[in-house]
Amino acid sequence: MGPPLAQELTQACNQPLAATSNLQPDDGYKIELRAENGVDKYPAKQHARKVAAQIRQGKGLIFLMGQKSTLHEDSDQERSLRQRRYFFYLSGVDEADCDLTYDIKTDKLTLYVPDFDLRRAIWMGPTLERKSALQKFDVDEVNYHSALDEDVKKWAKNQGPGSTIYLLHGSQGPTDNPSNVIIDTKTLKLAMDACRVIKDEHEIQLIRRANDISAAAHIEILRGITSMSNESHVEGSFLNTCVSLGAHKQAYQIIAASGSNAATLHYSKNNEPLRGRQFVCLDAGAEWNCYASDVTRTFPITHQWPSIEAKQIYQLVQEMQESCIALVKEGVRYLDLHFLAHNILIKGFLTLGIFKGGTLDEVKKSGASLLFFPHGLGHYIGLEVHDVSPQSIMAQGINDDSNNMLILPTCVSPCTTSSPALTSGMVITIEPGIYFSQLALENAKPEQLKYIDMARVKNYMAVGGVRIEDDILVTKTGHENLTKVPKGDDMLEIIRQGKKGNDSHHV
């Protein structure tokens, strides 16, 4: 069930790729994608210098191993490559069996590629060759892997006793560590995490492209949802569009959850029928050159709001998200946005009669809102979908006691008390949600149930869950929303126009 969008796109070097569809090309949503040929090299050398500056030592050797090619257990089939992200950050290389060194003192970044293997080249295609690798990647020198250990020994000899080799993990170092060097396995990760949290322009463009591809896939599903009958069709359509646009990998397991399945945060079966259900919650994001996107939209299976309750919950989540996004700028403490989202939820539930018999602060202190919004507002995004955070420092701001209940153990940076304030170059997600989980409600504490009208809640159980998620770049003047997928009434209009196109194809 391939989406028409994927069939219309032409991937020619230096040609724009327009995400249009013959279902309804005039619905106003076109995602323009441009081929990457001609884009500057991934700035590996710049990253190496940033990391060295964080290490704050005038000399030493950074040593990073790339991912090795391996077979599945008890099989002759290779595992799909997922490059080690720390290695990629200092190399830009997404190929197996490579390593690198960076000499801090001489500012020399060296890439080591596999030695030529004729048999493997015949079966799998040639691996990287020194000359082409030097042209392709932002490194100073390329050597074959067989020279690595000897090169490290020569470096250690020239440096003298007490020189330091910085490793990410003790098991990921030279085969034969020189005896006169210090092996440091703590400093490098902290330094790289501090660098990775602030994206440069090249990284932002990669995240932007991943988002554009994801947007094209999400929009195509909105256009076709009325003709789909199973969660698997939603997942298949998303994958089809992404692969057609050159994104062969997903940043994470696709969540295509309909009805009550959407109350399971990381639902992944994606195999149940859509009939009789109100919403689909689609959490899916393409990966581009190892950089992630993370996009969630919740939409009706028909071309209209399926119930008054569904519309009420959707609009409340949309208010939570848009209110939080509007406040994103440098200096803001992300955790305060998380608290704001809970406040909006509680006020909304008091208005709807789902919460009763208490003030906003009383309900908040009870933790009742956590039964319906049981995760953090979002996270960093980059080389990982839940990207690394800088070394924890106590963020400015005082935590109101009434908010303490809302800081969950599952909250990840920047949604923690120790996360730094938002800074230009950070890319974060804003992803509030409201879920009606039977399991959560059955295990609620008495102090939470005190403020919940369970008879009223029953009217909302069929909604399942609603989550809306965008990727937000923090800028010096505020923020930029990198996710170009419509919401609310604009979303419904695309579904309506898509239904017209689908109906015309069946005449």
Swiss-Prot record:
Organism, as annotated: Ajellomyces capsulatus (strain NAm1 / WU24) (Darling's disease fungus)
Entry annotated with the keyword Manganese: yes
Molecular function, one GO term: manganese ion binding
Protein name: Probable Xaa-Pro aminopeptidase HCAG_02413
Top EC class, one word: hydrolase
Xref: Pfam families: AMP_N, Peptidase_M24
Co-factor binding comment: Binds 2 manganese ions per subunit.
Entry-linked SMART domains: AMP_N (SM01011)
Described function: Catalyzes the removal of a penultimate prolyl residue from the N-termini of peptides.
Family indicated by similarity: Belongs to the peptidase M24B family.
Binding site for Mn(2+) 2: 283, 294, 469
EC number: 3.4.11.9
Residue numbers binding Mn(2+) 1: 294, 431, 469
One GO BP: proteolysis
Record field: catalytic activity: Release of any N-terminal amino acid, including proline, that is linked to proline, even from a dipeptide or tripeptide
Cofactor section: Mn(2+)
Keywords annotated in UniProt: Aminopeptidase, Hydrolase, Manganese, Metal-binding, Metalloprotease, Protease
SUPFAM superfamilies: Creatinase/aminopeptidase, Creatinase/prolidase N-terminal domain
Keyword Hydrolase: yes
